[in-house]
Amino acid sequence: GTYSAGCVAAKELCEKYPERRITVIDSLCGSAGLGLLVYMTAKKRDEGADLDAAADFAEKTKLTIGHWFTVDDLVYLRRGGRISPTAAVVGGLLGIKPVLHMDDEGHLVSFSKARSRKKAIQMLCDKYGELALSPKENPAIITHGDCESEAVELKKMLVEKYDANVIL
């Protein structure tokens, strides 16, 4: 995958530029989670951390980043082999909206199911409240795929309920 490709690229670059040091980290993150890890690690660098300290920080921090999300359409979960065709059809007819997360090994895991999009968004808000450490200091990043109004609503919920530092 991406980590293996990074290791191959690092090896080639180290051979070409032996005076430089490259550290590759398996972030176990995707999308905005990776962006958040890079942001937090760059902050450490800006505070004076050297390469080893920054890499150590990233290794320790990667498992504290939660990836929680919901999808509106089960088609892509079916196409990706995450759910059966029957489950996709039945779930679609019943209006099931799964709440998913990435586990500590980088695998997509189903956490819960909601009977409406609004309830799924509420579950995301509640899960944030359970898991967030220092919500004001550690940013939460909300991304969306063409559902900006719901992302704005989730941000509003997190800020009002938890005084969260949210990046949208």
Model-derived features with residue positions:
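Mixed-charge interfacial surface used for oligomerization/domain docking
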Residues: T2-T23, C29-L168
